């Protein structure tokens, strides 16, 4: 049976709750209960939720407060900074011309499902959209829009750093929150490692194109990449000032120094302050949007309308296949929600930043893809990861322009993702799921400096010595999984707390969130088999850490053991 128990000493969190007119209900589990009953209670506690009021009250504690300086324009720039990376230059050609896979592990799961349903053989490829790639971008933007609307509602209701992790804690329970918090490492930290390596490549290209400045092979590549290039020889080694690897203690050495330096520089800015970080991001966003607009405006005069015929050579299947590819050019808008505690008016500005950034990027993508397929017939882009350079091949400045745009694009992605990851770690540490050390706020700068520095060290260090390009798809599947839980969270919170004020409301609930879930699952199935295998391995590692560490240190769980529990039951338990 449940009965009142021990009085607890007041804590700083208790004081913050009292200021908001809230308190922890005092309950405990009778130690004389049968073991099965107590085990059942422990199992239920895995899905125990935190009320939005409690989450906001905990964040309002003076020692935890971040500096609120961001407005709607800053948030929109953060969203654009995260969304538009090198993908706009790399994915457009692939989606228009189609894709061929070399093995079963590289083939999307959906291809195997289609073969099983039709009784035919597995197709090792995806049809291209052709000039209808513009429609593919619209379809992908709409699919992303369902998730964006859900993020906007939850971000305005629960303006707390932590993004999908926090929303899952409020709607689906602690273990689901841990899973999504662990999963988001794939989007932010692992994704940033890959982006930093890509940034290094564009930096080297730009230095060569503009200043004829070349670097030694060993200084701008990790060891695996350097030895691979040496094995290829010939043109693969063109562009380096030296191809000899230094030897220390009998081992050849190669490091990607530019990748480390860009992560280090961004980390320093983020530690110094959110206002300075937002300003730096806005300037970078202006540069990369200007490059995209220039390419669109200049390319419009080179368009040959006959290249747009046939418009959809592979019909509806080609359009949807293209949408599955280009969807991943939209990933990143959710990073806006990690800055909720640093926004002056989060209830109003968070939805504006999330939705406005997605609309602007969709418009730019549609125009860019239309121009590229109008300049050259879409089949030219088969297997081409540099579609813009190919389209402007007759222009000597094309390579430098693409490198400059991609460099600006990846710089802002690194900045925004490095901004987002520490705030998720901070939110998890507040709840006891990570060491409290990670929840510390710098007394002067009011930034989560400990987690920011640690994230920078890990991301920069790994990017310096390893090329994790093969793991880039993990970012995609991790992000889609987060989108699914956020969409589910909207429906859950509408059911368990229908009376709560919602500054922004998703229209047509539960239809829109359900459509978001369905489309995200479909897009997850468009990812390779190997990505799914790696994803489940990653989740397995995360659950192991949860049960070995986080369960024993969870503040919610320790509250139950000490006579303190939450006032919100698991969402599947009717009260």
What does each model-identified segment do?
Residues 103-126, 166-167, 173, 205-224, ...:
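TM-loop-TM module centered on a large, flexible mid-protein loop between adjacent transmembrane helices
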Residues 90-231, 242, 357-360, 535-538, ...:
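Extracellular loop-to-transmembrane helix junctions
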């Amino acid at each position: 049976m449940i009965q009142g128990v021990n009085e607890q000493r007041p804590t700083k969190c208790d004081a913050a709750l009292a200021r908001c007119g809230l308190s922890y209900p005092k309950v405990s589990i009778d130690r004389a209960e049968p073991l099965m009953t107590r085990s059942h209670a422990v199992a239920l506690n895995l899905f125990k939720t935190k009320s939005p009021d409690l989450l906001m009250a905990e964040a309002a504690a003076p020692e935890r407060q971040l500096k609120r300086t961001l407005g709607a324009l800053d948030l929109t720039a953060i969203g654009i900074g995260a969304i538009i990376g090198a993908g706009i230059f790399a994915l457009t050609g692939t989606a228009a011309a189609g894709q061929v896979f070399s093995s079963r592990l590289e083939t999307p799961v959906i291809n195997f499902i289609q073969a099983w349903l039709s009784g035919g053989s597995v197709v090792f490829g995806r049809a291209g959209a052709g000039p209808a790639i513009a429609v593919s971008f619209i379809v992908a933007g709409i699919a992303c829009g369902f998730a964006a609307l859900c993020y906007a509602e939850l971000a305005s209701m629960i303006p707390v750093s932590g993004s999908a992790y926090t929303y899952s804690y409020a709607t689906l329970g602690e273990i689901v929150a841990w899973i999504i918090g662990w999963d988001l490492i794939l989007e932010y930290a692992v994704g940033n490692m890959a982006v930093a390596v890509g940034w290094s490549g564009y930096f080297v290209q730009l230095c060569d194109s503009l200043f004829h400045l070349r670097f030694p092979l060993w200084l701008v590549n990790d060891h695996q990449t350097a030895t691979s290039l040496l094995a290829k020889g010939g043109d693969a080694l063109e562009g380096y000032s030296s191809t000899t690897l230094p030897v220390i203690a009998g081992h050849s050495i190669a490091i990607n120094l530019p990748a480390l330096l860009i992560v280090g520089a961004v980390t320093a800015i983020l530690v110094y302050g959110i206002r300075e970080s937002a300003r730096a991001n806005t300037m970078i966003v202006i540069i990369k949007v200007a490059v995209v607009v220039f390419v669109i405006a200049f390319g419009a005069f080179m368009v040959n309308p006959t290249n747009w015929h046939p418009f959809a050579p592979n019909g509806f299947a080609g359009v949807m296949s293209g949408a599955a590819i280009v969807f991943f050019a939209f990933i990143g808008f959710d990073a806006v929600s990690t800055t909720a505690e640093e926004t002056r008016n989060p209830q109003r500005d968070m939805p504006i930043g999330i939705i406005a950034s997605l609309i602007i990027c969709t418009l730019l993508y549609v125009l860019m893809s239309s121009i590229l397929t109008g300049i050259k017939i879409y089949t030219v882009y088969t297997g081409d990861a540099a579609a813009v350079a190919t389209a402007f091949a007759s222009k000597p400045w094309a390579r430098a322009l693409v490198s400059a745009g991609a460099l600006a694009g990846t710089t802002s992605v690194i900045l925004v993702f490095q901004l987002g990851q520490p705030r998720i770690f901070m939110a998890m540490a507040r709840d006891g799921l990570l060491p409290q050390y990670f929840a510390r706020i710098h007394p002067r700068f009011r930034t989560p400096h400990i987690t920011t520095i640690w994230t920078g060290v890990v991301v920069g260090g790994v990017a310096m010595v390893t090329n994790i390009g093969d793991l880039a798809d993990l970012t995609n599947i991790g992000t889609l999984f987060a989108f699914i839980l956020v969409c589910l969270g909207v429906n859950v919170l509408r059911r368990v707390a229908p009376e709560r004020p919602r500054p922004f409301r998703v229209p047509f609930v539960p239809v829109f969130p359900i459509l978001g879930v369905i489309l995200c699952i479909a897009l997850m199935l468009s990812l390779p088999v190997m990505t799914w295998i790696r994803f489940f391995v990653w989740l397995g590692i995360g659950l192991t850490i949860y049960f070995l560490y986080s369960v024993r240190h969870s503040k919610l769980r320790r509250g139950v053991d000490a006579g303190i529990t939450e006032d919100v039951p698991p969402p599947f338990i009717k009260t």
